[in-house]
Amino acid sequence: MSDAMDVLLAGRIGLLVRIQSHPGARLALLDALNDYCENLDQEPGTEAFMIALDPSDEDVIWLYEWFTDQEALDAHRASDAFADLMHRMPELVAVPPGVLPINPLRVRLAKQPLEQSL
């Protein structure tokens, strides 16, 4: 049997978010998102928050998030850390973020990436 994390996610709520920074502001936007990520322990219903770079556009960042349920998503949006992030966003983003609601079904992660830390 594999040591991979393999979880069914039925009932979870997910978001795929596309954020386009002002030209040259991607590093500042990444700093803001990483600062936000450091506070996710204050949101117990936020189960995953992934930041990814768009390889074809140096001004675009993608977020993948999933939450235990609607109540957790509402708590996420009502958190102080989220309010701080939203306060920083206007000077960093070129257009309003695109948000695509999704329903996560399953995640499988190999053990090795989980053992590596920042």
Predicted stretch roles:
Residues 20-29:
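Short, surface-exposed ligand-recognition loops at beta-strand->loop->(often short) alpha-helix junctions
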